[in-house]
């Protein structure tokens, strides 16, 4: 059985810039920011 990777919890939090204004036209067909809540 391969060893489990440790999940880094604080690394995805530093993406706090305002990307939402610049990439808003890309995500109109596919709401990417909606899948933030993940169960583990």
UniProtKB/Swiss-Prot annotation:
Q: Which gene encodes it?
A: PBP1
Q: Which GO terms describe its biological process?
A: cell differentiation; chromosome condensation; spermatogenesis
Q: Where in the cell is it found?
A: Nucleus; Chromosome
Q: A GO CC term?
A: nucleosome
Annotated keywords = Chromosome, Developmental protein, Differentiation, DNA condensation, DNA-binding, Nucleosome core, Nucleus, Spermatogenesis
Annotated protein name in UniProt: Protamine-1
Tissue-wise expression: Testis.
| Source organism of this protein record | Bufo japonicus (Japanese common toad)
The answer to whether UniProt assigns keyword Kinase to this entry is no
As one GO molecular function, the record gives: DNA binding
Would you say which domain of life the source belongs to? Eukaryota
Q: What does this protein do?
A: Protamines substitute for histones in the chromatin of sperm during the haploid phase of spermatogenesis. They compact sperm DNA into a highly condensed, stable and inactive complex.
């Amino acid at each position: 059985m391969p060893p489990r990777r440790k999940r880094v919890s604080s690394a995805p939090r530093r993406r706090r810039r305002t990307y939402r204004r610049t990439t808003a036209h890309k995500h109109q067909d596919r709401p990417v920011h909606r899948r933030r809540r993940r169960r583990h």
